[in-house]
Regions:
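Conserved glycine(s) in the ABC-transporter nucleotide-binding domain "signature"
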Residues: 1-78
Length: 78
């Protein structure tokens, strides 16, 4: 898992739109995935951003804890 996420604004026909991006594994490759949230002026789009960010950080935290446990399990006994 490549950790990384963010927000980008794309202008379409003169209007700004919000997109949340993150990395995903697809077919053994890491790709940057964009999720449309809505108009940059929309309060609902801002709420969707907060929800997407919280969900992503939760998944990333689970993956990091799993990796930590794997690494610690490989330590030789004291």
């Amino acid at each position: 898992m490549q950790i990384g996420c963010g927000l980008t604004t794309k202008e379409i026909r003169g209007r700004p739109y919000l997109y949340f991006w993150h990395y995903e594994e697809r077919g053994g490759r890491r790709v940057q995935v964009f999720r449309y949230l809505g108009s940059a002026r929309s309060e609902a789009a801002r709420q969707r951003l907060a929800e997407a960010l919280d969900a992503y950080l939760e998944r990333a935290g689970v993956e990091l804890r799993r990796r930590r446990a794997e690494i610690l399990a490989r330590l030789p006994p004291p």
